[in-house]
C-alpha cells in the first residue's frame, strides 16, 4: 500500500492555512452553504417514470463553489480526504485512505490505459488522484478544477506535469482537441453538472474512438422517496457534510451516457456509509480541539 499522498507536512500546511485564513475567505466559505445547498435539484425514480426532465445544478460554475473549495480542501487535508471524495467501501476493516487506494486501483483498471496514453481528470482537486492513476498506469495525466488554490498545489507537486493542470470548468467547453484523449474520469465532482447533455457530449468529443469515461458519484436509488421527511432530511444532512450538489436517480445518469454516444459498459452501486461515519468521528475530534483553541484565544472564534 505504497501510495500515501497526505503527509504530516501536508496536514501542517493545511492547519497553517486555516489558522491564517482571511476574514474575506472565511465569510465567503460560510456564506456558500446558504447559496449552494438550499433547494438543490433532485430527480427521483418517480420523476424518471413520469418522464420529468433531468434538472442540472445551476451553481456549478459559481464563485460560491470556488469559495467553498478554497477552504474545505484545507479541512479535508486535516482528515483522510485530501483527495476530496469519500470512496465506496471496498474493505470495511480498513481506513478511508486505504479504501481510496483500493478504489483508485479499480478505476485505473477500468480506464484501460497504456503507458503514454493521455488521461483527463474532471474536478482534479490538487492532483492527488491523478498522481496515483499515472503511477498505476504509466499514462500522462491532465486535470481541470474550478478552484485555483488547488491547481496551484498541483503545480507544486514534482510528480505532476505542471503544464497539464489548469483552472477549468467542465460546465463549459473543454480546452482539448477532438479525439485527443484516451480516457476521462471524474471522481465525485459530477453533482455540480449544470447541463448533463453538454458536459457528456464534450467528454465524448475529446475522447478518441474507443476511449473510456469513468465516473463515480452520488446517485438516488430506487428506494429514495422525496415525500418521506426522514429520508429527505438524511439526504440534506449528507449533502451538507459531503458537499454534493444535485441528487439524481441513477437511470438518469445511464441515459445521459447513452444520449452522448457512449456505450454503457457497467453501472454499479457501491455504498460508502461506514467510511463516512469514520470520517465524521475524526472531524468531531478536530472540532473539539478547535473549540478549545478558540476558547484559549489561540485562534479566532
Where are each of the predicted segments found?
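Short, glycine-/aromatic-enriched active-site segment of Class I SAM-dependent methyltransferases
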Residues: 219-244
Amino acid at each position: 500500500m505504497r501510495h500515501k499522498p497526505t503527509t504530516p507536512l501536508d496536514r501542517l500546511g493545511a492547519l497553517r492555512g486555516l489558522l491564517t485564513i482571511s476574514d474575506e475567505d472565511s465569510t465567503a466559505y460560510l456564506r456558500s452553504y446558504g447559496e449552494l445547498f438550499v433547494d438543490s435539484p433532485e430527480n427521483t425514480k418517480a420523476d424518471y417514470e413520469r418522464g420529468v426532465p433531468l434538472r442540472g445544478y445551476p451553481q456549478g460554475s459559481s464563485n460560491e463553489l470556488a469559495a467553498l473549495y478554497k477552504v474545505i480542501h484545507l479541512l479535508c487535508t486535516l482528515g483522510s480526504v485530501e483527495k476530496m471524495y469519500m470512496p465506496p467501501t471496498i474493505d470495511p476493516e480498513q481506513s478511508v485512505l486505504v479504501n481510496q487506494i483500493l478504489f483508485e486501483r479499480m478505476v485505473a483498471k477500468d480506464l484501460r490505459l497504456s503507458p503514454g496514453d493521455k488521461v483527463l481528470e474532471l474536478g482534479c482537486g490538487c492532483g492527488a488522484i491523478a498522481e496515483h492513476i499515472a503511477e498505476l498506469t504509466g499514462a500522462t495525466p491532465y486535470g481541470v478544477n474550478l478552484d485555483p488554490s488547488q491547481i496551484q498545489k498541483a503545480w507544486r507537486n514534482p510528480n505532476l506535469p505542471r503544464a497539464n493542470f489548469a483552472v477549468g470548468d467542465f460546465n463549459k467547453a473543454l480546452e482539448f482537441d477532438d479525439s485527443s484523449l484516451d480516457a476521462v474520469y471524474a471522481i465525485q465532482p459530477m453533482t455540480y453538472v449544470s447541463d448533463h447533455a453538454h458536459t457528456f457530449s464534450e467528454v465524448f468529443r475529446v475522447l478518441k474512438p474507443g476511449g473510456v469515461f469513468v465516473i463515480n458519484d452520488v446517485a438516488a436509488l430506487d428506494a429514495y422517496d422525496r415525500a418521506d421527511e426522514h429520508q429527505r432530511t438524511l439526504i440534506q444532512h449528507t449533502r451538507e457534510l459531503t458537499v454534493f450538489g444535485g441528487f439524481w436517480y441513477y437511470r438518469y445518469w445511464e441515459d445521459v451516457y447513452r444520449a452522448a454516444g457512449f456505450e454503457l459498459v457497467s453501472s454499479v452501486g457501491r455504498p460508502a456509509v461506514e467510511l463516512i461515519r469514520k470520517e465524521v468521528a475524526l472531524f468531531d475530534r478536530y472540532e473539539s480541539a478547535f473549540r478549545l483553541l478558540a476558547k484559549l484565544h489561540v485562534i479566532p472564534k
